[in-house]
A protein has these predicted regions:
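Metal-dependent phosphohydrolase cores
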Residues: 1-197
């Protein structure tokens, strides 16, 4: 657990994570944030606002995206939704609030996570894989609906079989360990031994 003796974060704007790490959302600094916190929170966050059946997590989605991109992009793809440890808002909610507004407010958090874990996820290949996963989730986990999904590519051929939060947490951490050598040191990532704090 980090301690800032000069500036105690306000509980109304600070997030307490499973390890005891505190992230102040008004001045986010993810230095020292353990990947185990990200993994556990992503494994506990449902995709689709909880509408998917069986229950399906952001961690599972992230692992799938990491497997659908060229190998050099797999680490960044795994981490592409890591800020959603705060909660995975369904896209229609973000559109209703204003995508630019949501991106602007979340940008400091995402940038802090990018520096901490050393990744750059704004790549068209990652976005395409994200949409393929979305289409696959629609096919495999959600009921048919009278909604236009024309912006989505074809789903992946493999069927999604959700594994539940505990296994999703383990899968995310295993994939992270497999890929962390792809972290970009120029993004100020901390030494590998501190990544697994």
């Amino acid at each position: 657990m980090q301690a800032n003796l000069l500036n105690k974060p306000d509980g109304r704007t600070a997030i307490l994570l499973p390890s005891g790490f505190v992230l102040d959302l008004l001045a986010p600094d993810a230095t020292g944030l353990p990947i185990t916190d990200i993994a556990l929170c992503l494994a506990s966050q449902p995709r689709w606002g909880g509408a998917a059946r069986p229950w399906y997590s952001v961690a599972e989605h992230s692992v799938m995206v990491s497997r659908l991109v060229p190998p050099p992009l797999a680490y960044a793809a795994l981490m592409h939704d890591c800020e959603e440890f705060l909660g995975d808002w369904p896209s229609p909610v973000k559109v209703m609030l204003g995508l630019d507004f949501v991106r602007h407010r979340m940008q400091p958090v995402k940038d802090s996570l990018r520096r901490r874990f050393g990744f750059h996820d704004e790549r068209p290949e990652i976005k395409h894989a994200d949409l393929v996963c979305m289409a696959t989730e629609l096919r495999d986990l959600l009921p048919p609906a009278w909604i236009e999904w024309g912006h989505l590519p074809a789903p992946h051929h493999a069927k999604i079989v959700p594994v539940g939060p505990d296994r999703a947490n383990a899968l995310f951490l295993e994939r992270f360990e497999e890929l962390k050598h792809l972290a970009e040191p120029e993004r100020n990532v901390l030494p590998p031994e501190s990544v697994a704090d």
